[in-house]
C-alpha cells in the first residue's frame, strides 16, 4: 500500500460513518456488513496511527483527528462526484460516431434509422461511411460495423451481432425470363455473374459450398461497390451475390429473389469498439442491432 494515500475503500467507509454518525447506517449505504465498515475504519486508524472515533453514550464520536479527516474526505468525495457527473453528462451529450460500410448504410441501416432513434433516443448517433476502409481505431470514431472473421484483437471490444450469410440474388423478372427461378445452382456456371472488387472471394466461396468448381465461374460486369452491384441486379442486368441484410428489404419488396438461398460463412457482422473508450452506449446499440438482424 502506498504511504501517501490510504486505501480508498477504507476512506470511503470512514467518510460514510463520519457523515452519518453511525457504523450501521454507513454499512447500509455502502451495502456491506457492519463488521466490514468497522474493519475498514480500524485499518485506516492503523495506517494513519491515530484514533478517528471515540465512544459516547449514543454511538460513535469523532476525535479531533477524525473531524479533520472527515472534512477533507467530504470535500474530496464531493469534488469526485461532481467531476464524475460532468463526465457522464459529456458522454451522454456527445454524439456516438458509428462507421458503417456505405452499402450496408444505404440498404439496411438508413431504412431502420428512425426505429433506432426512437428505441435509443439518448444515443445521438452520427453516421460515417467507411466503404472499403476497415479502420475501427480511426480518430473520431466511437465504433464501427464490419464483416470480419475471428479471432478478435485484444485492444478491441467486439460485439458479435450475426453470422454472415451470403447468396446469389436476381431480379424476379430476369429469373422468370431465363428460367433461373427453378434452375439448380449449377445453372449459374452458364451465366455471366455480376461481381464487385470489394468481395472478390464471394462467388468462389459460394461455388465451393455448392460443390462447384470456382474456376468454372463466368464473370460479367464488375462494380467497385456492393451498392452498385445490387442496383444492377435490381435492374435485371444479371445475377449478383451479397450478404443477406443488404438485400433483405429488396427481397421483401419483390425487387430481388434468392432462388438458391444463403450460405453461412466464417465471417461475422460485428460492432467494433476500441476497448479504451468504455462507452456504455455501445452495448445498448449492439443489443438493438442483434434484435434487428435476427428479425
Curated annotation (Swiss-Prot):
What InterPro entries does the entry give? LysR_subst-bd, TrpI_PBP2, Tscrpt_reg_HTH_LysR, WH-like_DNA-bd_sf, WH_DNA-bd_sf
CDD domains xref list: PBP2_TrpI
Instruction: State the DNA-binding region(s).
Output: 23-42
Q: PROSITE patterns annotated for this entry?
A: HTH_LYSR (PS50931)
Q: Which GO terms describe its molecular function?
A: DNA-binding transcription factor activity; sequence-specific DNA binding
Q: Which UniProt keywords apply?
A: Activator, Amino-acid biosynthesis, Aromatic amino acid biosynthesis, DNA-binding, Repressor, Transcription, Transcription regulation, Tryptophan biosynthesis
What does induction of this protein depend on?
Negatively autoregulated.
Which residue range or ranges hold the HTH lysR-type domain? Answer: 6-63
What GO cellular component entries does it have? protein-DNA complex
Example of a GO biological process term? DNA-templated transcription
Function according to Swiss-Prot or TrEMBL: Activates the expression of the trpBA genes, which encode the two tryptophan synthase subunits, and represses initiation at its own promoter. Acts by binding to two adjacent sites in the intergenic region. In the absence of the inducer indoleglycerol phosphate (InGP), TrpI binds to site I. In the presence of InGP, TrpI binds to site I and site II. Binding to site II is site I dependent. InGP strongly stimulates binding to site II and is required for maximal activation of trpBA.
Tell me the subunit arrangement: Homotetramer.
The entry assigns this protein to a family as follows:
Belongs to the LysR transcriptional regulatory family.
Q: What else is known?
A: The trpAB promoter and the trpI promoter overlap, so that RNA polymerase cannot form open complexes with both promoters simultaneously.
* Record's protein name: HTH-type transcriptional regulator TrpI
- Provide the species name: Pseudomonas aeruginosa (strain ATCC 15692 / DSM 22644 / CIP 104116 / JCM 14847 / LMG 12228 / 1C / PRS 101 / PAO1)
List the gene name. trpI
Amino acid at each position: 500500500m502506498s504511504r501517501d494515500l490510504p486505501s480508498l475503500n477504507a476512506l470511503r467507509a470512514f467518510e460514510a460513518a463520519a457523515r452519518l454518525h453511525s457504523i450501521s447506517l454507513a454499512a447500509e449505504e455502502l451495502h456491506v456488513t457492519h463488521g466490514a465498515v468497522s474493519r475498514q475504519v480500524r485499518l485506516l486508524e492503523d495506517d494513519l496511527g491515530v484514533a478517528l472515533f471515540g465512544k459516547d453514550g449514543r454511538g460513535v464520536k469523532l476525535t479531533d483527528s477524525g473531524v479533520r479527516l472527515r472534512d477533507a474526505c467530504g470535500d474530496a468525495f464531493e469534488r469526485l462526484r461532481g467531476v464524475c457527473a460532468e463526465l457522464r453528462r459529456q458522454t451522454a451529450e456527445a454524439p456516438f460516431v458509428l462507421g458503417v460500410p456505405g452499402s450496408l448504410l444505404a440498404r439496411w441501416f438508413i431504412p431502420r434509422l428512425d426505429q433506432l432513434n426512437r428505441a435509443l433516443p439518448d444515443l445521438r448517433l452520427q453516421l460515417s461511411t467507411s466503404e472499403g476502409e476497415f479502420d475501427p481505431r480511426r480518430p473520431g470514431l466511437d465504433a464501427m460495423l464490419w464483416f470480419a472473421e475471428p479471432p478478435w484483437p485484444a485492444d478491441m471490444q467486439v460485439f458479435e451481432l450475426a453470422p454472415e450469410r451470403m447468396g446469389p440474388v436476381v431480379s424476379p423478372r430476369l429469373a422468370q425470363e431465363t428460367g433461373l427461378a427453378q434452375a439448380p445452382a449449377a445453372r449459374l456456371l452458364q451465366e455471366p455473374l455480376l461481381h464487385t472488387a470489394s468481395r472478390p472471394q464471394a462467388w468462389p466461396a459460394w461455388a465451393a459450398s455448392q460443390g462447384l468448381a470456382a474456376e468454372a465461374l463466368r464473370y460479367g460486369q464488375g462494380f467497385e461497390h456492393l451498392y452498385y452491384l445490387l442496383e444492377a441486379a435490381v435492374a435485371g442486368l444479371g445475377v449478383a451475390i451479397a450478404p443477406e441484410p443488404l438485400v433483405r428489404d429488396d427481397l421483401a419488396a419483390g425487387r430481388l429473389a434468392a432462388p438458391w438461398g444463403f450460405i453461412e460463412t466464417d465471417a461475422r457482422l460485428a460492432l467494433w469498439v476500441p476497448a479504451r473508450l468504455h462507452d456504455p452506449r455501445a452495448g445498448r446499440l449492439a443489443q438493438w442491432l442483434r434484435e434487428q438482424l435476427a428479425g
